Amino acid sequence: MEVPPPAPRSFLCRALCLFPRVFAAEAVTADSEVLEERQKRLPYVPEPYYPESGWDRLRELFGKDEQQRISKDLANICKTAATAGIIGWVYGGIPAFIHAKQQYIEQSQAEIYHNRFDAVQSAHRAATRGFIRYGWRWGWRTAVFVTIFNTVNTSLNVYRNKDALSHFVIAGAVTGSLFRINVGLRGLVAGGIIGALLGTPVGGLLMAFQKYSGETVQERKQKDRKALHELKLEEWKGRLQVTEHLPEKIESSLQEDEPENDAKKIEALLNLPRNPSVIDKQDKD
């Protein structure tokens, strides 16, 4: 069976075949899609949060801020614990150093040394061992004691949003009870009473000093917190205004660049490879 010859192409068809055939349906809506996509990606600016309740302030105390930094109160607790550990180490280590050196000299009277330097070095080694051993015992106990006391006291101050003498008494009682909890119920009660008695004069002195200065520590912190919140609120309002005007700026910039973008798109369309037509396929057949 013979295949019928292809129909002759007209002059208009031949002229149109010189241009590449492309499907540009997606290019028509490119600008609108870009605008919608940019509007969807607008940054969300949350409103700054101000803690009102006691639990919110406690979460702020033991949590981290936007820059992943701990609070100043928690940093002060850590610094105080490190300082107390060093002081306790020195307080327990120096007497132990002297006592261990004297005890070694008394117990080594009958020993024979090669020279005087060897004897002095042996005595210093014994004294250093005593300094490290007893200094460590005093150091970690003092650090833990001060950490528990400051943590309880600071937590009560932050939760109630004020300073009070009862906070020092409660902190001393809790710390003393925890330190004597291994003895039993009697040790727990006795440690709490001793801790409360020790916390009362300390709290009284600090409260008197704050009253003499005219402003408590918690009042100063509250003022600083409010000032920081107002600063964050102003910054949030400024960022919110920028975010509201951002779609208009994007749309205006797209309209300004529209002729240049159209010229680039036309040039890109003309540079695309030519699509095979039905007439060309028939010619090949």
UniProtKB/Swiss-Prot annotation:
Record's subcellular location: Mitochondrion membrane
Protein name according to UniProt: Complex I assembly factor TIMMDC1, mitochondrial
Keywords associated with the record: Chaperone, Membrane, Mitochondrion, Phosphoprotein, Primary mitochondrial disease, Transmembrane, Transmembrane helix
Pfam family, one: Tim17
Keyword match Cell membrane: no
Main localization, broad class: mitochondrion
Pathological association: Mitochondrial complex I deficiency, nuclear type 31: A form of mitochondrial complex I deficiency, the most common biochemical signature of mitochondrial disorders, a group of highly heterogeneous conditions characterized by defective oxidative phosphorylation, which collectively affects 1 in 5-10000 live births. Clinical disorders have variable severity, ranging from lethal neonatal disease to adult-onset neurodegenerative disorders.
Record field: transmembrane: 80-100, 137-159, 165-185, 189-209
Residues found modified as Phosphoserine: 277
Tissue specificity annotation: Generalized expression enhanced in heart and skeletal muscle.
InterPro entries assigned to the protein according to its UniProt record, in alphabetical order: TIMMDC1
